[in-house]
């Protein structure tokens, strides 16, 4: 008892020797009983509250899960394992393996966009290890990574648009697929935004006729091995690698393109592409090359001197925005059937030299934007251009900041209706020969000589602009002094009002 008392002293420093009172046994027992009672009341109450909270939360989330899961298709997406389809003959099972990276479970998995009713050829669709007879698009219930196997009950002849718009597909494996009868691969992966890799194995493409838009819009595709492709019967490659924005290197040296008739937009928008091997290309039957390399802005050079272009009719925007290419060797190109050079070299900001003096332009109708913003182009020999069929030359040399002279005396402009901005912002242009221009049909000439800062002499004596109404921006920003040779009888009032002050007018 004494030790207990000493403890009380330690715990209660306010007590001293003069106020020490011997503890009452009765009071001590009462105190112990009270403490025991309080503890016995508090502990169960706290435990009960915790248990009740957990139980309530469990009921709540279970209810939410039940309501959500009832909205999903009746397929098993929770078991995330590959099924085993091992076989000594890889193609005997005739299936395609897929991997999906599902970030938004509300987006449907587009597997059946084909117009040739591919879903009727599907034997089973295995999702997460369980075979499901699914004949319509479905959604993954939860975000995550999934493995899917599509097994076919017979040989297909077409894969057209099979995965088109399948934005959550990341990897496709055709190693076990029987491709012997395939003739159509157009749009196969078009719009597969998350596709990064495709394993084709020994995919048989011998009978394939079209690969149009095959990888178009695969903006995350970063590697492709097509070394086993037999393209000897392919006729359509237009848009094949368009918008492959992460593709750095592409080796097509094995491609046989002797039967290809369309290559338009083939590499368009593949702005990360740095290495492109087309050494085996035979383009002797190609008719359309428009936008073929459009916005391949990372390509440092293009080895296309061997291209045969005698059947090509359209070269619109073929090199548009090839910003790093400094020179093009087109000396062997036959352009006799081409009708459009529109935007052909526009945006080639580093282009300094291009040999096109031999071009046959006798059938060309469109030359608008042809050299637009060729900022480093210093020389251009186009004296031999035949332009009698051309209807538009709008912005043809606009932004050619380093070009110092242009001899267009041989140009026949009798059918041109639009010359707007034709020489605009050619800041360094000192010599411009347009003395033989015929402009009777021209309807637009606005901005034609804007910002020709170095130009001191201009012969527009043959200009007939009576039908052209230009209220402003004909000579805006031109050199403050110079000479203009003009025929006042053929010049509209709108142009007369804009003749630059400080210039000497010489009537012819």
Feature locations, PLM:
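Small/polar residue-rich beta-strand/coil "junction" motifs that cap repeat-based extracellular fibers
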Residues: 448, 472-477, 483
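Register-specific detector for alpha-helical tandem repeat solenoids, activating on a conserved position
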Residues: 160-161, 186-187, 212-213, 238-239, ...
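N-terminal capping/linker segments that flank leucine-rich repeat
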Residues: 5-26, 33-181, 187, 201, ...
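Structural signature of tandem-repeat unit edges
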Residues: 146-155, 168-181, 193-209, 219-235, ...
């Amino acid at each position: 008892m004494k030790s207990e008392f000493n403890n009380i002293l330690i715990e209660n420093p306010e007590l001293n020797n003069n106020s020490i009172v011997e503890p009452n046994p009765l009071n001590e027992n009462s105190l112990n009983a009270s403490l025991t009672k309080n503890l016995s009341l508090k502990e169960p109450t706290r435990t009960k509250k915790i248990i009740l909270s957990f139980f309530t939360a469990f009921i709540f989330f279970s209810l939410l899960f039940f309501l959500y899961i009832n909205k999903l298709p009746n397929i098993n997406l929770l078991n995330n394992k590959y099924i085993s389809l091992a076989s000594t003959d890889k193609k005997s099972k005739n299936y395609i393996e897929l991997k999906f990276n599902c970030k938004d479970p509300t987006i449907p998995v587009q597997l059946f966009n084909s117009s040739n009713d591919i879903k009727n050829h599907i034997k089973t669709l295995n999702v997460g290890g369980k075979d499901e007879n699914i004949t319509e698009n479905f959604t993954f219930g939860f975000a995550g990574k999934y493995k899917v196997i599509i097994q076919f009950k017979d040989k297909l002849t077409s894969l057209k648009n099979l995965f088109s718009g399948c934005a959550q597909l990341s990897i496709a494996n055709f190693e076990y697929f029987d491709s012997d009868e395939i003739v159509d691969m157009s749009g196969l992966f078009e719009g597969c935004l998350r596709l990064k890799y495709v394993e084709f194995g020994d995919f048989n493409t011998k009978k394939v006729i079209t690969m149009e838009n095959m990888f178009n819009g695969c903006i995350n595709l970063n590697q492709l091995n097509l070394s086993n492709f037999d393209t000897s019967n392919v006729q359509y490659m237009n848009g094949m690698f368009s918008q492959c924005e992460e593709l750095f290197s592409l080796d097509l040296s094995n491609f046989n393109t002797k039967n290809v008739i369309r290559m338009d937009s083939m590499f368009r928008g593949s702005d990360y592409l740095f290495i492109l091997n087309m050494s085996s290309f035979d383009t002797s039957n190609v008719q359309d090359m428009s936008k073929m390399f459009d916005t391949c802005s990372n390509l440092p050079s293009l080895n296309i001197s061997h291209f045969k272009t005698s059947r090509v009719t359209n070269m619109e925007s073929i090199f548009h925005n090839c910003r790093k290419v400094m020179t093009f060797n087109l000396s062997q190109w036959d352009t006799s059937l081409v009708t459009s050079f529109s935007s052909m070299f526009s945006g080639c900001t580093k282009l300094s030299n291009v040999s096109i003096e031999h071009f046959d332009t006798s059938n060309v109708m469109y030359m608008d934007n042809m050299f637009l913003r060729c900022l480093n182009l210093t020389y251009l020999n186009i004296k031999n251009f035949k332009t009698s069929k051309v209807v538009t030359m709008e912005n043809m040399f606009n932004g050619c900041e380093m070009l110092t002279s242009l001899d267009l005396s041989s140009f026949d402009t009798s059918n041109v209706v639009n010359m707007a901005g034709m020489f605009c912002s050619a800041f360094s242009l000192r010599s411009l020969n347009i003395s033989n221009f015929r402009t009777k049909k021209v309807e637009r000439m606005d901005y034609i000589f804007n910002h020709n800062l170095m130009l001191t002499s201009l012969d527009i004596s043959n200009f007939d602009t009576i039908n052209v109404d230009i209220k402003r921006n004909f000579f805006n920003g031109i050199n403050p002094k110079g000479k203009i040779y003009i025929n006042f009888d053929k010049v509209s009032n709108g142009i007369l009002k804009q003749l630059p002050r400080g210039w000497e007018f010489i009537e012819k």
